[in-house]
Amino acid sequence: MKKVTLFLFVVSLLPSTVLAWNTPGEDFSGELKLEGAVTSTRNPWVWKVGQGNESLEVKQSRGVRDGEQGIPVALPALTVLLGKTTLTTPAGREGLSPGVSYGKGAEGFSLEWTAPGMAKVTLPVTGDKNVRAGTFTFRMQAAGVLRHMQDGQPVYTGVYDDLNANGLPGESTAMKTSDIPGTLQTMFSGEGPSWLQTMTVSGYSGVSHFSDASLRQVEGVYGAQIVAGGGELHLNGAMPERWRVSLPVSIEYQ
């Protein structure tokens, strides 16, 4: 009986106009109002792969013709991949954390994080008639930032891989926080969000924290770039007329 009494009491608090009928025979007009919060499920990340370079010149030498040594390749700094959020997500949620992976399905591919924010990448080389001709090695740097609001102030943290992907270093080899702003500003060259130019990065978070529901007003950036110089071509035998490498890129959200 107590439950019934409480229920009736709650109902009695509803506006009487909800249950009111109009006077018989009079003209009638009314309005039904519906409202609620809007939660966007649109993924805010956009990505751009670098243009590459098809004019890298390699000079022959006797040792190279015999397949006995590597050939230095003067690489310029080249964009590998840029990513940014174009919308501010009200709170972290599932499906917002990007797992960037390189080299999926490429036989002979390897990526090893050797220094803070720096990786050694090895790709298989194809030569004439798409025949496997050797390997190409270069250095790549990568970093990301997670931005969210806390007590009315923006917080910027460097992100490291905790999704078992290879597009970011682990926590122990993450880029130094003091190096992240300048590095990403150079990579984006004015195409990043406005806060990229003024941010101060403090501390680190796993990239999975983009899905942390306790975070508010979530945004982020990611950048990877080939480091100028340091490329090396290793051939299995005679020098082909042309050599090619490609770096597969894939992104899965978690």
UniProtKB/Swiss-Prot annotation:
Subcellular compartments: Fimbrium
Cross-referenced Pfam families: Fimbrial_K88 (PF02432)
GO annotation terms (biological process): cell adhesion
Entries under InterPro entries matching the protein: Fimbrial_K88_FaeH
One GO location term (cellular component): pilus
Superkingdom, natural source: Bacteria
Keyword terms of this UniProt record: Fimbrium, Plasmid, Signal
Cleavable signal peptide: 1-20
Function: K88 minor fimbrial subunit, plays an essential role in the biogenesis of the K88 fimbriae. Fimbriae (also called pili), are polar filaments radiating from the surface of the bacterium to a length of 0.5-1.5 micrometers and numbering 100-300 per cell. They enable bacteria to colonize the epithelium of specific host organs.
Record family assignment: Belongs to the fimbrial K88 protein family.
Record-given protein name: K88 minor fimbrial subunit FaeI
Organism expressing this protein natively: Escherichia coli
Lineage: Bacteria, Pseudomonadati, Pseudomonadota, Gammaproteobacteria, Enterobacterales
Gene designation: faeI
